[in-house]
Amino acid sequence: MTKRLKIIIIFLMALNIFGHANSNENFFEKGLELYNNKKFDDAKFMFERSIVFNPKDSNSYLYLAKIYNQKKNQRKEEKNLDATLLIEPNNEEAILMLMKIGLEKSNYSKVKDLSETFTQVCKKLCNENKKILETLEN
């Protein structure tokens, strides 16, 4: 009888651990779906829940930054971009978004520093860096 009880307890614990591992992905995927449907408040909630289960999920921070960009809350946008880069320093999308914020704030030295980093890590968005550098020259 005690063997069965131990097996049942171990089985339930394994299910619980597996459920927590999957829940983070479910929250992020649901948040992404809501974000793509422009339901930003609901998406924000899901990304925040994703972060609760996995504080090192750089994509959740990135999408929170995008939501704050839509809501014109630059302070929170920048905070989430910084968190993204703390976790994933080579995230070209986060670097690019910070460069745009730097341009808006006329912080040209920061933009140049970020541009150098961006040049080293860019894979998909390399043309965007050229546009920003042209804006700096003007």
Q: Could you describe each region identified by the protein language model?
A:
Residues 36-37, 70-71, 104, 135-138:
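Register position in tetratricopeptide repeats
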Residues 50, 83-84, 117-118:
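Canonical positions in the second alpha-helix
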Residues 53, 87, 120-124:
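Structural marker of alpha-solenoid helical repeat scaffolds
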Residues 63, 97, 131-135:
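Canonical tetratricopeptide repeat
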